[in-house]
């Protein structure tokens, strides 16, 4: 049976898409998939870090809008889907160990520990369908790429040991589209809401748009301005500063596609 095209993947309902991912039949990015369904960033920490991280999310709701938290040891997000298993239902994960480079895998079952707590954090991929419905084209989708993401100079509010930079995702738009995009995305605070910044990237510490820290470069036309939204990769940048002994995250751009609609929250 031939592999499904990306267009065919985009038409699949989330439970079917997750089954495909669970079997290891798709390991690519999820931008443009799930259509109107919420996508979630993933952070998995040992229980000793959970309360601190929960407070960090509460202090930084633009970057870390919390959609669900698992019980210790449970790999399930009951609020997001009946059959979700965070050990296998994302296309790619990063396993982070102190002092080592992250390892990317497509299943984390062998790494799972009894005291793990999983956090689902809202993702801007969720509001992309609303932008498309408003007639706003998205360059990274047109090019079949992941979105471009950057470590900014915008500091997060610290929580105990957790502090560091806000990561932002960038989408280039014309001025009229930018105004409409702000109006549209401000309706969805649980998927990062309105942009944190638009215009000169140097003002938020980004030197070169052609060299994103995560994701793929997305070209900017002469008549466009870059818009920057808070991004759920922020926890990875912050945790890299403090280096817990072990934690697991999604690989940037490779999200959990849930059964919840983005406009239900």
UniProtKB/Swiss-Prot annotation:
Q: List the disulfide bonds.
A: none
Record keywords: Lyase
A molecular function annotated in GO for this UniProt entry is: lyase activity
What domain of life? Bacteria
> Of which family is this protein a member?
Belongs to the D-glutamate cyclase family.
Q: What is this protein called?
A: Putative hydro-lyase PLES_32121
The protein's Enzyme Commission number: 4.2.1.-
Q: In its keyword annotation, does this UniProt entry include Translocase?
A: no
- Record bears the keyword Cytoplasm: no
- The species this protein was found in: Pseudomonas aeruginosa (strain LESB58)
- Name of a matching Pfam family: D-Glu_cyclase
């Amino acid at each position: 049976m031939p592999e499904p095209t990306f267009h065919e993947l985009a038409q699949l309902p989330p439970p079917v898409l997750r089954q495909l991912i669970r079997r290891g039949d798709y390991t690519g990015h999820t931008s443009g998939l799930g259509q109107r369904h919420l996508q979630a960033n993933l952070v998995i920490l040992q229980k000793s870090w959970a309360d601190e991280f929960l407070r960090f999310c509460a202090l930084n709701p633009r970057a870390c809008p919390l959609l669900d938290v698992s019980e210790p040891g449970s790999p399930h997000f009951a609020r997001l889907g009946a059959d979700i298993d965070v050990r296998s239902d994302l296309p790619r994960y990063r396993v982070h160990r102190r002092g080592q480079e992250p390892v990317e895998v497509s299943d984390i079952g062998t790494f799972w520990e009894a005291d793990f707590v999983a956090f689902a954090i809202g993702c801007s991929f969720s509001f992309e369908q609303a932008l498309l419905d408003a007639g706003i084209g998205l360059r990274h989708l047109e090019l079949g790429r992941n979105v471009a993401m950057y470590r900014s100079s915008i500091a997060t509010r610290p929580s105990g040991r957790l502090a560091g930079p806000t990561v932002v995702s960038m989408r280039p738009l014309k001025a009229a589209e930018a105004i409409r995009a702000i109006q549209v995305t401000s309706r969805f605070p649980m998927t990062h809401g309105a942009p944190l910044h638009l215009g000169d990237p140097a003002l938020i510490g980004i030197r070169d748009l052609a060299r994103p820290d995560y994701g793929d470069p997305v070209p900017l036309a002469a008549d466009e301005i870059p818009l920057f939204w808070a991004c759920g990769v922020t926890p990875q940048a912050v945790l890299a500063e403090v280096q817990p002994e072990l934690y697991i995250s999604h690989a940037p751009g490779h999200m959990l596609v849930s059964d919840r609609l983005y406009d239900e929250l």
